[in-house]
UniProtKB/Swiss-Prot annotation:
Gene source species: Prochlorococcus marinus (strain SARG / CCMP1375 / SS120)
Gene3D superfamilies xref list: 1.10.287.1480
Quaternary structure note: Part of the 30S ribosomal subunit. Contacts proteins S3 and S10.
GO molecular function terms attached to this record: rRNA binding; structural constituent of ribosome
Function: Binds 16S rRNA, required for the assembly of 30S particles and may also be responsible for determining the conformation of the 16S rRNA at the A site.
Record's keyword terms, sorted: Ribonucleoprotein, Ribosomal protein, RNA-binding, rRNA-binding
UniProt-listed GO biological process terms: translation
The keyword rRNA-binding is annotated on this UniProt entry: yes
Family of this protein: Belongs to the universal ribosomal protein uS14 family.
Cellular component GO terms held in the UniProt record: cytoplasm; small ribosomal subunit
The protein's name: Small ribosomal subunit protein uS14
Length: 99
């Protein structure tokens, strides 16, 4: 089980990403469409002024069962250990052993 503080930090980041997603997208669209270097610089400064944790790249995929940050399968949202356990128990529909 991951530390509760780390899980809470990721939840906080997820909320920030959702809150600033539209503003960040609008600024990035303006940045990519701008031709003037000074205008691009000004837009870049606005993007940098947004909270650091509002960037989607700062989010971490975590296992929803244990909160572990590593070895997480995107399709299931589970870490490798939980995926194996639940697959053996038959709790994951459509997942079968290969041999």
């Amino acid at each position: 089980m991951a530390k509760k503080s780390m899980i809470a930090r990721d939840v906080k980041r997820k909320k920030l990403v959702e809150r600033y997603a539209s503003k960040r997208k609008k600024l990035l669209d303006q940045f990519h469409s701008a031709k003037d270097p000074m205008e691009r610089l000004e837009i870049h400064r606005k993007i940098q002024a947004l909270p650091r944790n509002s960037a989607p790249s700062r989010m971490r995929n975590r296992c929803w069962a244990t909160g572990k940050p590593r070895g997480v399968y995107r399709d299931f949202g589970l870490c490798r250990n939980q995926l194996r356990e639940r697959a053996h128990k038959g709790e994951l529909p459509g997942v079968v052993k290969s041999s």
